[in-house]
């Protein structure tokens, strides 16, 4: 028991800074929406539409680069710190390639937006302007993630916390300048949010680079050459590990986007209630996703030290701590569901709908904690392909079809509307949690030499 309590303290020491960093980055999006809304409803809607296209694309790149964390954590644990700099250099090359692809996709976003029926032309123009502004921040964001993953792989999570919080603070005045046209800048409205966010991402990268170059804990991690050509075998290994993570992230984001579209014909009350429940759930999601990052670091580090037993302790401690947090956030969601809904909207019908859906959201958080932290465990073991297959089956084969059948058809019960889709979420996430937990158990039953060979490959 003492081992698990000690591990829980180590996990929380790593995880709490990640939680603050995640909340800071999420808050940047909230600030953009609120400040754009102060100009006009059209500007706020343009930011929302633009963000719905920007997020899946950029988070795909984020997911791909997440592979660096377990790679670096295991090198750190095994005493091979001399190899870390080359992994980071190749991470930058991967970020460059990703940035080119992302900018090319986002540059052509006008075609996607114009395909939406009955969209207001001014709204479409502003949304495209927002995307064309924020896309130039993609390289800065991805470069920042490369260095953040290096730090987190070395069990240094506080730099990401501090710099993300500074990014949030810097975002507000830059938004003010470009939205309202202050200090000689043009008044860009919602498009100014894109300019500000892109600028902040570059500032965050430069701050993280400054830290990494001066941190005493990383003085021994220096590249042999200031410029290193792409090493295709390293890039291939990072991509092979990161692509399943990126696809899993993409599956989850697009699932929620498609459900929002399927609910949209059910009326304003249904859409607003669903949006409130989903938005609040996404805030609560910061807890398990941050603990998952900490668990990946601890599992990877212990495997690097060839300590199979400590890696197992890290894995189960991470899942248990995640469940404790989920029980707390679920209880909070149930008890305060009406006041929470009132923070978003004062329409009685919307509040009733949102409050009802928050009950489903509370159940959802328990399964979500297991599957998210469990995925972090599997990343630590470098078993990312299974995450890809499990999330695809759970979300797209089980969750979405069951939600559609319950929400919009009379095949099993009379059409339940948004509630049916939330039951679908619970089915999908529970299936994912069961399959991921089973995969962890199977992995840990393998012979020690097989686990170490796979995890250090």
UniProtKB/Swiss-Prot annotation:
<feature type="transmembrane region" description="Helical">
    <location>
        <begin position="387"/>
        <end position="407"/>
    </location>
</feature>
<feature type="transmembrane region" description="Helical">
    <location>
        <begin position="357"/>
        <end position="377"/>
    </location>
</feature>
<dbReference type="InterPro" id="IPR022913">
    <property type="entry name" value="Multidrug-R_MdtK"/>
</dbReference>
<feature type="transmembrane region" description="Helical">
    <location>
        <begin position="11"/>
        <end position="31"/>
    </location>
</feature>
<keyword id="KW-0406">Ion transport</keyword>
<feature type="transmembrane region" description="Helical">
    <location>
        <begin position="243"/>
        <end position="263"/>
    </location>
</feature>
<dbReference type="InterPro" id="IPR002528">
    <property type="entry name" value="MATE_fam"/>
</dbReference>
<feature type="transmembrane region" description="Helical">
    <location>
        <begin position="418"/>
        <end position="438"/>
    </location>
</feature>
<feature type="transmembrane region" description="Helical">
    <location>
        <begin position="93"/>
        <end position="113"/>
    </location>
</feature>
<dbReference type="InterPro" id="IPR050222">
    <property type="entry name" value="MATE_MdtK"/>
</dbReference>
<keyword id="KW-0739">Sodium transport</keyword>
<dbReference type="InterPro" id="IPR048279">
    <property type="entry name" value="MdtK-like"/>
</dbReference>
<feature type="transmembrane region" description="Helical">
    <location>
        <begin position="53"/>
        <end position="73"/>
    </location>
</feature>
<dbReference type="Pfam" id="PF01554">
    <property type="entry name" value="MatE"/>
</dbReference>
<dbReference type="GO" id="GO:0005886">
    <property type="term" value="C:plasma membrane"/>
</dbReference>
<dbReference type="GO" id="GO:0042910">
    <property type="term" value="F:xenobiotic transmembrane transporter activity"/>
</dbReference>
<feature type="transmembrane region" description="Helical">
    <location>
        <begin position="160"/>
        <end position="180"/>
    </location>
</feature>
<dbReference type="GO" id="GO:0006814">
    <property type="term" value="P:sodium ion transport"/>
</dbReference>
<keyword id="KW-0915">Sodium</keyword>
<dbReference type="GO" id="GO:0006855">
    <property type="term" value="P:xenobiotic transmembrane transport"/>
</dbReference>
<keyword id="KW-0812">Transmembrane</keyword>
<keyword id="KW-1133">Transmembrane helix</keyword>
<feature type="transmembrane region" description="Helical">
    <location>
        <begin position="127"/>
        <end position="147"/>
    </location>
</feature>
<feature type="transmembrane region" description="Helical">
    <location>
        <begin position="188"/>
        <end position="208"/>
    </location>
</feature>
<feature type="transmembrane region" description="Helical">
    <location>
        <begin position="280"/>
        <end position="300"/>
    </location>
</feature>
<keyword id="KW-0997">Cell inner membrane</keyword>
<dbReference type="GO" id="GO:0015297">
    <property type="term" value="F:antiporter activity"/>
</dbReference>
<feature type="transmembrane region" description="Helical">
    <location>
        <begin position="316"/>
        <end position="336"/>
    </location>
</feature>
<comment type="similarity">
    <text>Belongs to the multi antimicrobial extrusion (MATE) (TC 2.A.66.1) family. MdtK subfamily.</text>
</comment>
<keyword id="KW-0472">Membrane</keyword>
<keyword id="KW-0050">Antiport</keyword>
<protein>
    <recommendedName>
        <fullName>Multidrug resistance protein MdtK</fullName>
    </recommendedName>
</protein>
<comment type="function">
    <text>Multidrug efflux pump that functions probably as a Na(+)/drug antiporter.</text>
</comment>
<keyword id="KW-1003">Cell membrane</keyword>
<keyword id="KW-0813">Transport</keyword>
